[in-house]
Amino acid sequence: MRRLRRLAHLVLFCPFSKGLQGRLPGLRVKYVFLVWLGVFVGSWLVYVRYSSYAELCRGHVCQAVICDQYRKGIISGSLCQDLCNLHKVEWRTCLSSVPGQQVYSGLWQGKEVTIKCGIEEGLDPKARSDLAPRQELVLFDKPTRGTSIKEFREMTLSFLKANLGDLPSLPALVGQVLLMADFNKDSRVSLAEAKSVWALLQRNEFLLLLSLQEEHASRLLGSCGDLYVTEGVPHGSWHGAALPPLLRPLLPPALHTALQQWLGPAWPWRAKIAIGLLEFVEELFHGAYGTFYMCETTLANVGYTAKYDFKMADLQQVAPEAAVRRFLQGRHCEHSADCTYGRDCRAPCDKLMRQCKGDLIQPNLAKVCELLRDYLLPGAPIELREELGRQLRTCTTLSGLASQVEAHHALVLSHLKTLLWKEISNTKYS
């Protein structure tokens, strides 16, 4: 016991000489107080972190709900057997950022995958995986029994029109949905298969995975009900994402830039990733299934493969133009800030009518170029930096209604891509 006391005394008071301790007796008390205050604050942060994790990470609840519905024959999917009966889907790290959308890294069929599943608001976050889900929850309620395949086709077409707009390409997308719905490849769509694919369509990211090219988004690998798996999480371009969520807002911009330069890819690789991001913006503007808006433009959403090809890390905040217009049109407002969809899709406010307009103020390209200024200018070759900075400044000033800047938008985007390709072409980085 005496040794323990001696050790504690050394730890707490050894930084101060005996002479100083004698001259400043109050310093001991202050030092002890600061040590215990540090212990208290540290314990509180650990508690908050654990509480936040318990709220955000509820994969066991997700799996319990899905497997309960599968065993009852309500849903189907290519993943169900491995997930619920054979237990061949391994859940690894929790990557969720909101409680309602569960995201995990995992392993399936020897591949690294990302597992995604929605949790209804009514589910108890403390529910255990061995407990049956609440019976009063209405899940997978459409289509109803007796719905013909023709009716389901029309139902799907109406849904896609409402979310993507009335486009001539939609019948082809409906055919793609019905082909996907036939999970067991028996050339017919059962009620369980129809319920499952309908539930998947309600997930914004799944709809985007169908609508956008696989080149810039993770490939869909399998599903069960409205749970689905995609290719593994791409490498992140924002190294502050590795920090705990509570500490991320505290990261100073200067430190953020320094982290990007020290830990990020070499500049030519960053240029290649940026070209992919610009091509993705081009696809959003001229896609086969209408126009899409990026409504949370951050480096946290910019990912890349092992070969430094751009991959969108998160499609949750990419929204179809029709959905954004429907949300904003006629919405009551006092200021433009009241006319915001997601984080940064903002429309003008008609102050006379006190209603939001449907067109966005800032196009995708202007928001992406703001990102690229911080991403590309640090470390850029000296002979390129001035011209690159000028073009990025021009790009960030793109304004006016998003639907009215198409020609200028295309010209600025083309100039930027050409400038970057010219720098890295005929090198190993291309």
Task: Cite the ranges covered by each PLM segment.
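ATP-binding glycine-rich phosphate-binding loop
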Residues: G26-N184, V197-F206, L210-E215
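Protein kinase-like catalytic domain
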Residues: Q213, V281, F285-A288, L372, ...
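Helical subdomain adjoining the active site within ATP-dependent kinase catalytic cores
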Residues: R2-Q63, R92-T93, A306, A313, ...
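Catalytic-loop of the protein kinase fold
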Residues: V281-D314, A319-P320
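Conserved structural core of kinase catalytic domains
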Residues: T144-L201, H216-A274
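Eukaryote-biased feature marking scaffold/signaling PDZ-domain proteins and nuclear chromatin regulators
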Residues: P99-Q101, G110, N204, E215, ...
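Amphipathic alpha-helical segments that line or abut small-molecule/effector binding pockets
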Residues: L207, P268-E282
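Conserved beta-strand elements of beta-rich interaction domains across eukaryotes
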Residues: Q109-V113, I119-G122, G225-Y228, P234-G236, ...
